[in-house]
Structure formats: structure tokens, C-alpha cells
Amino acid sequence: MSQTPVATTPRNYPIFTVRWLALHTLGVPTVFFLGALAAMQFIRR
């Protein structure tokens, strides 16, 4: 997957790809949710 010829065809691989959108729409809320759960562990009285 990391062997894609980016140097020969730079215009076929923009920044916002389907894989980029899928990773960030799943990853960003997941990391935020895990961070919120971890932060809640320290709020206990």
C-alpha cells in the first residue's frame, strides 16, 4: 500500500482522498471520545 508511485503521478493523489476522509471521520471522534473517557477518570471526588 505504501508502494504507490506518487512521484510519477502526483496529481492523482490529492490531500483529501476517500481513505483520508474515512480515517479522519472514524479516527478523530474515536480519539476525542477516548480522551474524554480518560479525562473523566480524574474528575472523581
From Swiss-Prot:
Residues involved in heme binding: 24
GO terms under biological process: photosynthetic electron transport chain
GO MF entry, a single one: electron transfer activity
Pfam families, sorted: Cytochrom_B559 (PF00283)
Localization (cell): Cellular thylakoid membrane
UniProt family annotation: Belongs to the PsbE/PsbF family.
Subunit details: Heterodimer of an alpha subunit and a beta subunit. PSII is composed of 1 copy each of membrane proteins PsbA, PsbB, PsbC, PsbD, PsbE, PsbF, PsbH, PsbI, PsbJ, PsbK, PsbL, PsbM, PsbT, PsbX, PsbY, PsbZ, Psb30/Ycf12, peripheral proteins PsbO, CyanoQ (PsbQ), PsbU, PsbV and a large number of cofactors. It forms dimeric complexes.
Name the record gives this protein: Cytochrome b559 subunit beta
Originating organism: Parasynechococcus marenigrum (strain WH8102)
